[in-house]
A protein has these predicted regions:
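Conserved acidic residues
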Residues: 21, 420, 533
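Conserved beta-strand scaffold positions in the cores of enzyme catalytic domains, especially
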Residues: 90, 257, 390, 464-466
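Beta-propeller folds
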Residues: 1-385, 400, 437-438
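Short beta-strands and strand-coil junctions in structured, solvent-facing domains, enriched
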Residues: 9-10, 188, 411-413, 431
Length: 567
């Protein structure tokens, strides 16, 4: 139907029209031609201009580097939006461009697009390039330009930094054609001392009336769960404190948000779950209400020290306590895939255990019956004899840690003695020691290695402590990375001592490994401890003078961290 092919460089290259009569597709321009080839003779130097102002920018990889890169970027990423009828007839919409996002309004009359423009940057990724967000008719006639912003090269290095002006534009799922977007109230600087950091705005078609403020958020806007005129849920998050707010709003009465809950979003035990969403008649995601319309359904992972036991519950629109309708029971890990009726009494779940491969089940909540729908077999029965259990152990300062211990099939500790052991880990930063110390038993999960998994070493006689907790904690205004090495040493020492004490690991044959930031961890443990004979540092960055404007979860610049600047 599209001879030139789809262009998936920016993601999924098609979307259905709400009435399912046609597709909107991002296609390769028909006249694209061959890719540009660089000449053997340089045409000139690479020139970068300074605007005469200081600007910190994180270190990124795989950036554009010269005019040839720019030409290749244009060649491969430029696309043409096309409307394709079920008959196969195709009609172009608007002009070709670097269209990073596109979506059709629920009534099928308008098209929201986000496209990149020149000049490009050699220091920043494409998401910071000059951007135009606009609304057109479904035939491509421009109706409204929401924003046409320049290169975002003046943002603070903080994670919650945001561009000035409209961003994160979307359609309201439960209205015919209402444009929704967020704007920073703090100039894009999350450190600004303001009561509200973002405002969420709405504007209904034909986009001539002034926008209205749906809600102002205490932290940086994250997402919205749409319902109807009377209820929607706006979520924001603040990285520095790991705080999340969930606000109840009534789109028909904008500006009257009320707080449903405030929580630490790293808190596994206190995770209330997320609203159940379904596709409405227009194919847009909306929350699922109870029949009396007094609550919405929510699902969550149900993390506890004894294990994760997913649940289905209802959350009153007025807030307050949830009502649990169903939760998984040992020895299973069973997630809710879909609700099969309006009352939450008939559900489709995906059930697994340490020994049983995941399969789908239709479950009667009230009656308790479970009818298998699929019968998928163990994809790697050679690993069926591998034993796995969650072990818990204390750090030197008393913090509870945990990890998943895997032992080879047929292994007997008394008969075979201690094994060479690999710790495969990844550090995580926390602002609350109680949250960092949460342990969740993984014994009800079905685990089989695939790809380049380190778990394949089980076939070679290794014991593996997978994902041993490596928390790096900064409480009370302190920065976690100020004690990174010390806490890393404590975490590793506790893990090694734990597996040696169990009699399954040989202290003289310990190895450590990790990917990316786990590779950085590996290098530090090899340099600062004598716990390990070898390490696997896979795809890491190790020289922090090459990432002076922040890395991973570190928001400070190198100079702020090494010589703190007075507040």
């Amino acid at each position: 139907m599209v001879a030139s092919g789809l262009n998936g460089t920016f993601g999924t290259p098609f979307a259905w029209m709400p009435d399912s009569t046609a597709l909107i597709a991002y296609t390769v321009p028909a006249n694209r031609g061959p890719a540009p080839v660089a000449g053997d003779t340089p045409t000139g130097p690479v020139v970068q201009e300074s605007a005469g102002r200081s600007s910190a920018a994180r270190t990124y990889e795989d950036l554009l580097g010269d005019a040839q890169d720019e030409a290749l970027f244009d060649h491969y990423f430029t696309g043409q939006l096309v409307r394709i009828a079920l008959s196969g007839a195709a009609r172009p919409i608007g002009a070709p461009g670097l269209i990073t996002e596109f979506s059709v309004s629920p009534d099928g009359r308008y098209l929201l697009t986000e496209r990149l423009k020149r000049p490009y940057s050699y220091l920043l990724p494409a998401r910071y390039f000059p951007t135009e967000i606009a609304v057109a008719t479904i035939d491509g006639q421009r109706v409204r330009t929401l924003v046409d912003r320049p290169l975002a090269d003046d943002l603070p290095v903080d994670f919650d930094a945001a561009v000035k002006g409209p961003r994160e534009a979307m359609w309201r799922s439960d209205a015919p054609a209402t444009l929704v977007w967020a704007e920073a109230l703090d100039g894009g600087n999350p450190r600004a001392k303001v009561a509200f950091h973002d405002v969420v705005k709405m504007q209904a078609a034909p986009f001539e009336a002034a926008p209205v403020d749906l809600a102002m958020t205490p932290a940086r806007y994250a997402t919205t769960f749409w319902g109807d005129d009377g209820f929607a849920m706006v979520v924001d998050r603040e990285w520095r404190s790991r705080t999340e707010h969930r606000l109840a709003v009534a789109p028909a009465r904008p500006g009257q948000a009320r707080t449903l809950l405030t929580r630490n979003y790293q808190d596994q035990y206190g995770d209330p779950g997320r609203p159940v969403v379904e596709s409405n008649a227009a194919g847009k995601p909306v929350m699922r209400f109870t029949p009396d319309h007094k609550a919405v359904y929510v699902t969550g992972d149900g993390a506890t020290k004894a294990g994760a036991f997913p649940f289905l519950a209802t959350l009153p629109l007025t807030g307050g306590e949830q009502t649990r309708l169903w939760s998984a029971k040992p020895p299973y890990y069973e997630t809710v895939v879909a609700m099969l009726d309006d009352t939450g009494q008939r559900i489709l779940t995906r059930r697994e255990s340490a020994k049983l491969a995941p399969n789908y089940v239709v479950r009667s909540v009230r009656g308790g019956s479970a009818k298998p729908v699929t019968a998928f077999a163990d994809p790697a029965p050679v690993f069926a004899g591998v034993t796995q259990r969650t072990i818990t152990y204390p750090r030197a300062d008393g913090l509870a840690l945990s990890g998943s211990l895997y032992l080879p099939a047929g292994y007997d500790a008394k008969r075979d003695g201690p094994l060479p052991t690999l710790l495969w880990a990844y550090p995580a930063e926390f602002t609350d020691a109680k949250v960092a110390g949460q342990t969740v038993d993984q014994g009800n999960r079905f685990v089989r290695p695939r790809g380049i998994s380190h778990l394949f070493l089980l076939t070679q006689g290794y014991a593996i402590l997978d994902n041993p907790a490596m928390p790096i904690i900064g409480e009370g205004g302190t920065e976690a990375n100020d004690t990174y090495v010390k806490q890393l040493q404590q975490n590793a020492q506790a893990a090694v001592d734990a597996v040696v004490k169990l009699g399954v690991a040989d202290r003289t044959r310990m190895a450590v490994g990790g990917h990316s930031y786990g590779a950085f961890m590996t290098a530090n443990l090899l340099a600062h401890t004598d716990l390990f004979r070898a390490g696997i540092a896979r795809s890491g960055a190790y020289n922090r003078t090459l990432t002076p404007f922040g890395f991973q979860a570190e928001q400070r610049t190198y100079w702020q961290a090494t010589r703190p600047i007075p507040k």
